[in-house]
């Protein structure tokens, strides 16, 4: 083929595949959030004939809550994601980390009572840990009914790992396996370790401001006294600044920024994320800080832990110590060496491989013979 013929072919392909709008000189970036989210929505669109893309408001124990179900094949095993916080939703960042999951799982994201898209000032007084336990049971019942699958995988992150572990203990018959990411075991002990780590970092870095502020809340999380939220926020300020929430980053703002690009969220939803988290933390965190699963030493369901090596926000070392004592039909622990607390977005590739290679086969092992996704990718 001559050079002129090749050039003509390239030019023809260009005009065939690119619209005039894209060709316009200087028109190289989205002009608004709406345009940006439309691009992302197009990239993640599920186009398989049997595919499922559902985003709907569901009545959960009298409170309207948003649930999404996404899958290229709804026969694939269900994976319910229970977000952390309290109030730190995963749905609006799942466009980044979970698209690959949807090829092999039926992925369910749930914005918990009062969080994210489910924010409603009228239900603030109903935000209790007991109510959240009732809600997760109701959500699981709804998901089982809607998908026609009796068992599912439950992935709980951070605060969501408390709810998830509770379900695993009470209703192992509902689960193929429980997956804990940033697993909460004993919050008071985790807080103590976090304070000590932050103080040591401050000393080594010669950060006088950090040392002074951390010293101002000492002794921190000692005994059974209630931990004031103001003390918690100050401890977290320095834990996060020193990389204990996101590895080698001063905070998790990179993740928070991704919320604005979610195709599932309206502008109002994005604004409500921050209001909702403030309310959820105020209402739920005192009880979370007093919670402990350290005495739980046996589960009747396979357990997989995903832990960030540098997680100080919720002590991964404490979770590993607990896991060593735990008895379960099958258990595996996976370390994420380049992550702290936000491993889902810090190492999404390794998360995906772990889900495919280590989690997915458990659906077949627990009797889901119809599951299409249990065959690993070739």
Q: Each predicted region: which residue ranges?
A:
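Conserved alpha/beta-hydrolase
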Residues: 102-119
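Conserved acidic catalytic loop of the alpha/beta-hydrolase fold
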Residues: 133-151
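A catalytic-pocket lid/entrance helix-loop region that shapes and gates access to the active site
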Residues: 176-221
């Amino acid at each position: 083929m001559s050079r002129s013929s090749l050039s003509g072919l390239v030019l023809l392909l260009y005009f065939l595949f690119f619209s005039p709008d894209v060709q316009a000189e200087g028109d190289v970036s989205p002009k608004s959030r709406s345009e940006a989210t439309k691009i992302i929505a197009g990239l993640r669109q599920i186009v398989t004939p049997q595919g499922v893309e559902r985003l709907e408001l569901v009545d959960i124990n009298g409170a309207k809550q948003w649930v999404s179900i996404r899958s290229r094949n709804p026969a694939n095993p269900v994976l319910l994601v229970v977000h952390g916080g309290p109030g730190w939703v995963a749905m609006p960042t799942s466009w980044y980390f979970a698209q690959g999951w949807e090829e092999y799982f039926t992925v369910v994201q749930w914005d918990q009572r009062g969080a994210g898209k489910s924010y409603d000032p009228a239900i603030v007084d109903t935000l209790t840990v007991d109510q959240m336990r009732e809600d997760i049971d109701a959500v699981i019942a709804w998901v089982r009914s809607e998908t026609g699958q009796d068992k599912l995988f439950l992935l709980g992150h951070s605060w969501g790992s408390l709810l998830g572990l509770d379900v695993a203990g009470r209703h192992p018959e509902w689960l193929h396996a429980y997956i804990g990411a940033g697993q909460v075991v004993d919050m008071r002990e985790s807080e103590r370790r976090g304070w000590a780590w932050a103080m040591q970092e401050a000393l080594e870095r010669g950060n006088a401001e950090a040392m002074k502020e951390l010293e101002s809340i000492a002794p921190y999380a000692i005994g059974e006294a209630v931990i004031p939220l103001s003390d918690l926020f100050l401890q977290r300020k320095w834990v996060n600044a020193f990389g204990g929430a996101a590895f080698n980053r001063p905070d998790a703002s990179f993740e928070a920024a991704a919320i604005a690009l979610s195709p599932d969220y309206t502008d109002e939803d994005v604004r409500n994320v921050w209001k909702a988290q403030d309310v959820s933390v105020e209402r739920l965190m005192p009880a979370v800080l007093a919670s402990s699963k350290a005495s739980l030493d046996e589960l009747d369901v396979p357990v997989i832990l995903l832990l960030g090596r540098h997680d100080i926000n919720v002590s991964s070392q404490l979770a590993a110590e607990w896991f060593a004592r735990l008895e379960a039909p099958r258990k595996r622990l996976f370390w994420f060496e380049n992550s702290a607390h936000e491993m889902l977005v810090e190492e999404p590739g390794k998360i995906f491989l772990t889900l495919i290679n280590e989690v997915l086969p458990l659906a077949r092992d627990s009797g889901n013979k119809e599951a299409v996704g249990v065959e690993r990718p070739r």
